[in-house]
């Protein structure tokens, strides 16, 4: 999930919702949080990973172009960091890039290796 000002941003339901979310994130830092539960016979590991992401101030044209071209309706917070908006919009990232993409693979790898 994407969190800004204590508001949880899920996937946008339409263009207007995506526009609202991107405007809310524009020029600010927000958090991306992923919960993970790994289960194997006789073993379970639960954790969450949080990454801070900062966007530049996005112009109306940039927001409209991104929504129209990339249709981010399947992404929490209405953006994919691995897409155009991430290339031009993200000015800082503190934490796991892969967490923002959707799965904190390094942390999962560490947890699985610690199991052995």
Residue ranges and their predicted role:
Residues 1-116:
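Anionic-ligand binding patches
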């Amino acid at each position: 999930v994407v969190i800004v000002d204590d508001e949880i941003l899920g996937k946008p339901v339409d263009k207007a919702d995506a526009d609202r979310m991107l405007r809310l994130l524009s020029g600010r830092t927000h958090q991306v949080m992923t919960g993970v539960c790994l289960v194997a016979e006789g073993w379970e590991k639960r954790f969450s990973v949080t990454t801070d992401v900062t966007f530049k101030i996005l112009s109306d044209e940039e927001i409209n172009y991104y929504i129209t071209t990339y249709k981010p309706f399947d992404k929490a917070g209405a953006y994919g960091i691995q897409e155009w908006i991430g290339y031009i919009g993200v000015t800082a990232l503190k934490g796991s890039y892969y967490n923002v993409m959707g799965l904190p693979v390094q942390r999962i790898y560490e947890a699985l290796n610690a199991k052995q």
